[in-house]
From Swiss-Prot:
It comes from the Eukaryota. It is an enzyme of class 2 (transferase). One of its GO terms (cellular component) is chloroplast. One of its GO terms (biological process) is glycolytic process. This is ATP-dependent 6-phosphofructokinase 4, chloroplastic. Residues 1-54 form a transit peptide. GO terms for molecular function: 6-phosphofructokinase activity; ATP binding; metal ion binding. Pathway: Carbohydrate degradation; glycolysis; D-glyceraldehyde 3-phosphate and glycerone phosphate from D-glucose: step 3/4. It catalyses: beta-D-fructose 6-phosphate + ATP = beta-D-fructose 1,6-bisphosphate + ADP + H(+). The lineage of its organism: Eukaryota, Viridiplantae, Streptophyta, Embryophyta, Tracheophyta. Belongs to the phosphofructokinase type A (PFKA) family. PPi-dependent PFK group II subfamily. Atypical ATP-dependent clade 'X' sub-subfamily. Its main location: plastid. Expressed in leaves, stems and flowers. Allosterically activated by AMP.
């Protein structure tokens, strides 16, 4: 038996008894005493959520003895189709799984979000473990699946496509699989192709996406109309935060219409800015490819007098690629990311640090994420904010701007001869095939998505949480952007490696500290804080 505690915009929750085997909504409600919520005025997007928190417990549930176990569960088709029949999983007859000690994942298997705990800590948030279930809710010969890719390119997309097709076919005997071409627009423009293991056999060796992609174009009603008209009952959506929000809307419309359609998201972002999961696919490949650009910049600046090389890497709001590429390379003197505001002039500023390094080494390399310093650039260029078709802010070229600022300062103010080298490998990094590590990772993501859809789960995304693959509600990965936390040890390791200034003593430092404190409050907001 489970008890579900519901916080629906009120400080006085209700508790309901819930039978996990029935997959239906709670039926008996009785009020709990009013609880005092920890007030955090900076969290409007969290406090407005109408989240259902399920605390697993014994039959004799006592709220005061709650150990803080929270299951962030994913929807199941039986939630709105209670009479949906189930069938034995075809993997029972699979030779591949014949010698596996434990073929099927138990409904009680969960993955903990936080594995570093102290004595007396609450058990915290958990997610359902990914993997095959003993019962499935689709007959193999009745499955009509489709796959769509949306948003920007990323190494590994083709591997995910290939492994979804091969997973459905080889593990579950599914033969009817469609590829939706050109992103979400492909649903209602009817651009499709049939996918078989033979068709996708070697696409993992190519960069880009075999199905083509686009930004924007999401029209929920048109998309679900097309899904319904075609008789599609499994939808696999590969894309970033905006794409996953679209996937959630598709699931909600499918549920509203009462359709037996499983909607599965596979998170994709080269920036590694997806929340909850350990990392996004393609990230390792991007970091590895970035080394070539950094090495080239280092060779260039070593070969001239007072050489300063700038390498601009991807990272709209999150500086993970720049940070990890810098740590991996060891030839970088300074790393600038969106999360850490910097300033140019004055004591402790970037210009002062550059001059010190040039006097010491006669050259230096700067790695900057594309989203860093955007306020400075916009102010300098007097540019207004514009957005792309996905609603993302169009970034100004901070690399070119910084190159010119450094050149002007040292030429006109310091009267120093300086040789600037600027490298922008953005499209080179994201357009390549995935490396061996990402290929394996993409395979696990694809197979986890297939197992989840066949088991009747819907409105979920997949990914590793503390190295264990889990099913995660889509809302969990779209509510917050994963960013580099300046209070974590990883950023401290980078500062120790480059010996660069922290930029906490100059203009914008106060706001930077406030932002860090706000992030800590978000991280610390657990079930134990209410």
């Amino acid at each position: 038996m489970e008890a579900s505690i519901s916080f629906l915009g009120s400080t006085k929750p209700n508790i309901s008894l819930f039978n996990p085997s029935s997959n239906v909504l709670p039926r008996r409600d009785f009020p709990l005493p009013a609880l005092k919520l920890k007030k955090v005025s900076v969290l409007p997007r969290i406090l407005h959520q109408k989240r259902l928190i399920r605390a697993q417990c014994s039959d004799g549930f006592k709220p005061e003895e709650d150990d803080g176990f929270v299951l962030e569960d994913v929807p199941h088709l039986t939630k709105f189709l209670p009479d949906l029949p189930s069938y034995p999983n075809p993997l029972k007859e699979s030779q591949a799984y014949a010698i596996v000690k434990r073929t099927f994942v138990s409904s009680e298997d969960v993955v903990a979000q936080n594995i570093v705990v102290q004595k007396g800590s609450k058990r915290g948030v958990h997610f359902r473990r990914a993997g095959p279930r003993e019962r499935v809710y689709f007959r193999s010969d009745e499955v009509k699946a489709c796959i769509v890719t949306c948003g920007g390119l990323c190494p590994g997309i083709n591997t995910v496509i290939r492994e979804i097709v091969c997973g459905l076919n080889n593990m579950y005997g599914v033969n009817n699989i469609l590829g939706i071409q050109g992103g979400y627009r492909g649903f209602y423009s009817k651009n499709t192709m049939n996918l078989t293991p033979k068709v996708v056999n070697d696409i993992h060796k190519r960069g880009g996406t075999f199905l083509q992609t686009s930004r924007g174009g999401h029209d929920t009603a048109k998309i679900v109309d097309n899904i319904q008209d075609r008789g599609i009952n499994q939808v696999y959506i590969i894309g970033g935060g905006g794409t996953q929000k679209g996937a959630e809307k598709i699931y909600e419309e499918v549920e509203r219409r009462g359709l037996q359609v499983a909607v599965s998201g596979i998170p994709k972002t080269i920036d590694n800015d997806i929340a909850v999961i350990d990392k996004s696919f393609g990230f390792d490949t991007a970091v590895e490819e970035a080394q070539r650009a950094i090495n080239a910049a280092h060779v260039e600046v070593e070969s001239v007098e007072n050489g300063v090389g700038i390498v601009k890497l991807m990272g709209r709001y999150s500086g993970f690629i720049a940070m990890i590429a810098t740590l991996a390379n060891r030839d970088v003197d300074c790393c600038l990311i969106p999360e850490s505001p910097f300033f140019l002039e004055g004591k402790g500023g970037l210009f002062e640090f550059i001059e010190e390094r040039l006097k010491e080494n006669r050259h230096m390399v700067i790695v900057i994420a594309e989203g860093a310093g955007q306020d400075y650039v916009a102010q300098s260029m007097r540019a207004s904010e514009t957005k792309d078709a996905s609603g993302n802010r169009l970034l100004l070229d901070v690399g070119l701007w910084l190159t010119q600022q450094i050149k002007d300062h040292f030429t006109n103010v310091r009267k120093m001869m300086i040789n600037m080298k600027y490298i922008d490998p953005t499209y080179m990094i994201r357009a390549i095939p995935s490396n061996a590590s990402d290929n394996v990772y993409c395979t696990l993501l694809a197979q986890s998505a297939v197992h989840g859809a066949m088991a009747g789960y819907s409105g979920f995304t997949v990914g590793p949480v503390n190295s264990r693959h889990a099913y995660i509600p889509i809302s969990q990965v779209t509510e917050v952007t994963n960013t580099v936390k300046l209070t974590d040890r990883m950023w401290a390791r980078l500062l120790a490696s480059t010996n660069q200034p922290s930029f906490l003593t100059g203009e914008g430092a106060l706001q930077n500290v406030i932002d860090m404190e706000t992030q800590e409050k978000i991280d610390n907001m657990k079930i134990s804080s209410i």
